[in-house]
Amino acid sequence: METIYYLPGRGGRLHSGLGKAIHDHGFDITGRETVGTFSELVFSEQVAAVAQDLRSHFWNGSARVIANSFGAYLFLHAQAGLPAFPGRVLLLSPIVGGFYDDSLGTGLVPPLAEKLFQLARSGNMPNPKSCEMHVGSQDWQCDPEKVCDLGALIGVSATVVPGAGHVLGPRYVGQVLDLWLQ
């Protein structure tokens, strides 16, 4: 059985939610749960662990990575310090930097919030060989405009899902997985 490297969102586990859906498609799963010991690491240590996982076990053209929300942010920061990832990457509701929603009066400022855009604008952000991003049009955590802007800067396709929020929904994600995991 082929193994997918999976990075769930904050507080996520490998074998529930999206991880279960990946497994139900007939794949083994490995990666980093964003709970417990891993969540207690500082951001740079989390990024280094992901980069080491990728280099040690998934650095080949047939490797596949799926990352969701903050897991996508971890992947992108790991990718920033590596050559272009040689396999395929699927990023769902990817955090790509800081965001504030005036209408909700809430925001999100992850560690190194501007780094990805700084690297991309300077031409120093390696983009994976094959990558796609999907974000909801109503996602307040992952500004769809910023996701599309980053995608354009690094040559990665970004699909905006009309009416969807941060959770893209099992039907949409199931359809994406059906195609992407073939």
Task: Please name every model-derived segment.
Residues 15-16, 140-146, 169:
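Conserved alpha/beta-hydrolase "acid-adjacent" motif
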